[in-house]
Amino acid sequence: MGLGLIMPVLPTLLRELVPAEQVAGHYGALLSLYALMQVVFAPVLGQLSDAYGRRPVLLASLAGAAVDYMIMASAPVLWVLYIGRLVSGVTGATGAVAASTIADSTGEDSRARWFGYMGACYGAGMIAGPALGGMLGGISAHAPFVAAALLNGFAFLLACILHKETHRSHGGTGKSVRIKPFILFRLDDALRGLAALFAVFFIIQLIGQAPASLWVIYGEDRFQWNTATVGLSLAAFGATHAIFQAFVTGPLSSRLGERRTLLFGMAADATGFVLLAFATQGWMVFPILLLLAAGGVGMPALQAMLSNNVSSNKQGALQGTLTSLTNLSSVAGPLGFTALYSATAGAWNGWVWIVGATLYLICLPILRRPFATSL
């Protein structure tokens, strides 16, 4: 939610620090810096949590984020904001630790459901965060940063009281811990056998960057949406996505199994993309949102497939690798999809959705292969 809080006002804050013509460039650079730091540090935090436990890593990250947001709230010069975003990328790379906590605390038959709940929480944060950030931004461009600091501080206190250690095999060995920040490019032996599934994970995350980067532009160009309609569509997507991940993923995985649930999600998302490409009226998008939300059940199922193939003492490394792949897609995806959109919009601006749907076909031969469980 902290990221969602500051996104609406970050350009406004930049206008206080740099000339107007430089705002867009610095805005893009700050987003890329945040994502790149998560690419590097998500596996580091995951490995640290394997070695020392989930709780201390999570607490340190929450405390660091609270201090960092408060510093950014009072950033007097541009370089302080850059340092702040760099630190935010590091302290915000705790998705791997949270996912590892779920893997520690659940059995193989219920992990997909709990990963779905986690995805729903992210979705809820990305609905409430921008809405609250926009309102606070009307008071001051600095107010959302203060709110983000307070929320992280509150989360730190809650975690101190409520969060119990879930990783039982850490600490007390006296052995040095070897951290591999670039584990994404040199996989641990225990993860190397899952390289094909990692490729599927990356492709699906990459496809997800199409709506993330082009939803507003496409709505304005194709349907002449105004700001209010764009906001309504984003809220509707976030709400339906959260509902499907929270309440559909678990029962569907129990009924179909993780692999078939993943295939169902891919098919739903691809169908939604194709329909979106050919939609001619803005109202058509809203029923299509149900297909896109149904597509969201695939990712928790894939996370469960991967988690079930890794031993308990490698869950942090696994989740760190997945988080790095997610953040790598958030760097590459917007660049690729926006370039494709710019190149084809003059002829027909639906090509980006057709390409996104077609990318799913790459995953099908990989998913036909058998994968062991509980390696």
Question: What kind of feature is each model-predicted range?
Answer:
Residues 259-302:
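C-terminal transmembrane helical hairpin of 12-TM major facilitator-type secondary transporters
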Residues 156-162, 354-375:
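Multi-pass alpha-helical transporter architecture, strongest
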Residues 164-200:
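Juxtamembrane intracellular "pre-TM" segments in multi-pass secondary transporters
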Residues 137-150, 339-360:
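A membrane-interface helix-boundary motif in multi-pass transporters
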Residues 9-24, 213-230:
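Short amphipathic helix-loop junctions that connect adjacent transmembrane helices
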